[in-house]
């Protein structure tokens, strides 16, 4: 399998080491057809985008600049903020790709949610929070499932299947096992392979994720951004 698109990459707008243009040029050099920039949303205390208007504007400009060479997707990596499924999607911006994950440095909705998502090991509650977020919001991709907080992969896979959300296989965070992916797949989930690149040189670098997908028994039809 060969990667065709990398939708989860970071730039200097959060904690990446290169600008949007550098990531895009790296994607072109890697032979990708599409590239997404998805920096951390506003309630990530350490790395959240500080000027969302400028961020979105720069991505829209890049989309126009590279038209005809590569498809550029404007993205945002949202934080799961509460057990009720609250997320920090900025209003008034039409992002092409919305990615959702649990991040330890997020500004959570309340103490109960912070405790559960930061320190809790209650798989049922955390999975429920993901499910609520998927039901209430347009979530295109679940980022690094199981990273930072335990989840029920079968239940999450079923929700992804029901709502058209993609289950990410992340090349950077390597806690996901082949059996976890297989469990999500058994519930009808579809998948996306991501580099989660924080430097331009890592854009499209997903060999680990591709090997993991193969070990889980996934076919090309189950992964949206690969081809033969």
Question: What label would you give each PLM region?
Answer:
Residues 1-11, 20, 90, 95, ...:
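Charged catalytic cores and adjacent phosphate/nucleic-acid-binding surfaces used
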Residues 14-20, 83-85:
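Glycine-rich anion/phosphate-binding loops
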Residues 15-18, 46-50, 203-205:
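Short, solvent-exposed loop/turn segments at secondary-structure boundaries
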Residues 21-36, 57-68:
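Alpha-helical scaffold segments that flank or form the walls of functional sites
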Residues 34-36, 71-73, 192:
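A structural signal for isolated positions on well-ordered beta-strands in alpha/beta enzyme cores
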Residues 35-46:
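Short, conserved active-site loops that position catalytic residues or coordinate cofactors/metal ions
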Residues 40-41, 103, 172, 197:
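Short, ordered loop/turn segments at secondary-structure junctions
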Residues 45-165, 214-222:
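Extended substrate/RNA-proximal surfaces in nucleic-acid metabolism proteins
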């Amino acid at each position: 399998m060969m990667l065709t698109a990398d939708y989860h990459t970071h730039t200097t707008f959060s904690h990446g080491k290169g600008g949007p243009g550098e990531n895009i040029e790296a994607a072109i050099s890697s032979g990708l057809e599409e590239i997404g920039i998805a920096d951390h949303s506003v309630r990530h205390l350490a790395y959240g985008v500080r000027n969302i208007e400028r961020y979105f504007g720069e991505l829209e400009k890049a989309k126009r600049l590279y038209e005809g060479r590569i498809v550029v997707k404007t993205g945002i990596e949202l934080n799961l903020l509460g057990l009720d499924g609250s997320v920090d999607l900025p209003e008034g911006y039409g992002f092409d790709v919305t990615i959702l994950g649990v991040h330890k440095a997020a500004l959570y909705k309340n103490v109960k949610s912070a405790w559960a998502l930061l320190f809790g090991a209650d798989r049922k509650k955390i999975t429920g929070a993901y499910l609520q977020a998927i039901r209430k919001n347009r979530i295109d991709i679940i980022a690094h499932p199981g990273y930072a907080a335990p989840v029920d992969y079968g239940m999450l896979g079923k929700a992804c299947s029901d709502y058209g959300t993609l289950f990410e296989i992340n090349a950077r965070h390597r806690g996901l096992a082949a059996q976890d992916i297989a469990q999500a797949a058994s519930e009808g989930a579809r998948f996306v392979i991501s580099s989660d690149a924080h430097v331009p040189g890592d854009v499209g670098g997903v060999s680990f994720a591709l090997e993991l997908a193969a070990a889980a028994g996934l076919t090309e039809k189950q992964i949206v951004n690969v081809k033969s």
